[in-house]
Regions:
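Conserved G/P- and acidic residue-centered "switch" motifs that form tight phosphate/ATP-binding loops
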Residues: 109
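Residues forming the Rossmann-fold NAD(P)(H) cofactor-binding site
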Residues: 112
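C-terminal interaction modules of eukaryotic adaptor/scaffold proteins
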Residues: 1, 169-179, 185-189
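Acetyl-CoA-dependent GNAT
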Residues: 14-16, 22-23, 27, 34-106, ...
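Short glycine/proline-centered loop/turn elements that form peptide/ligand docking sites
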Residues: 115, 143-146, 163-168
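Conserved catalytic-core motifs of GNAT/GCN5-like acyltransferases
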Residues: 136-138, 151-175
Length: 194
């Protein structure tokens, strides 16, 4: 265990040292399982300002096929967790619940690899058969970096929700959507520039 922590700290130090150069790194993607759920909990604690309740992790068991862990040098440095939902106007949607990257590894193309994975997954035959029509997520209105990031992947701002978040300032969020599998966006697009 001590050896693993030394390896993690060495890799984090390397990540911080290389971050200024922003060299792109390649993730090894792995499945989320009940056995490695504890690693995801630790990653989320390190990367998010809110603490996810145990129920969040219990619910993830239903959505393992839409979650991926990202490893660099055998250390968990990022993840994406999505769930499949019914849409009110028919078909299904994939909701991005969390996308996380450890701070020393940000701006290294890792989040892009995770988002590209879910975009590819949404276009798979299995998801087409499930009638997946869009991917969507919530982004805090002050998070200009995230807004610009998702727009690069074709997401559009379709709604602003006031007081969405609790114990975070500002509490408001935008809903970002991206149509999938030949479907059109069924929501009005708001003109929000990050």
């Amino acid at each position: 265990l001590k050896g693993l922590w030394l390896k993690i700290h060495r890799i984090m130090a390397e990540g911080e040292a290389e971050a200024s150069g922003r060299r792109k790194l390649k993730l090894d993607l792995g499945s989320l399982t009940e056995k490695n759920m504890g690693q995801l909990k630790k990653l989320n604690t390190a990367t998010f300002p809110v603490k996810y309740k145990d129920q969040f992790y219990l619910d993830l068991v239903k959505y393992f096929e839409f979650c991926r862990l990202g490893f660099y040098a055998d250390v968990l440095v990022g993840s994406i967790c999505c769930r499949l939902e019914d849409r009110t106007d028919g078909g299904k949607a994939l909701y991005i619940m969390t996308l996380s990257i450890l701070k020393p590894y940000r701006q290294r193309n890792l989040a892009s690899q995770l988002v590209q994975w879910i975009l590819d997954r949404a276009q798979s035959k299995e998801c087409q058969d499930k009638d997946v029509r869009e991917i969507y997520l919530h982004v805090q209105t002050s998070n200009k970096t995230a807004l610009a990031f998702y727009k690069k992947f074709g997401f559009k701002v379709t709604e602003k929700i006031e007081d969405y978040y609790h114990n975070i300032d500002p509490p408001d969020c935008y809903v970002l959507r991206r149509p999938m599998n030949g479907h059109d966006l069924t929501h009005e697009v708001l003109d929000i520039n990050p």
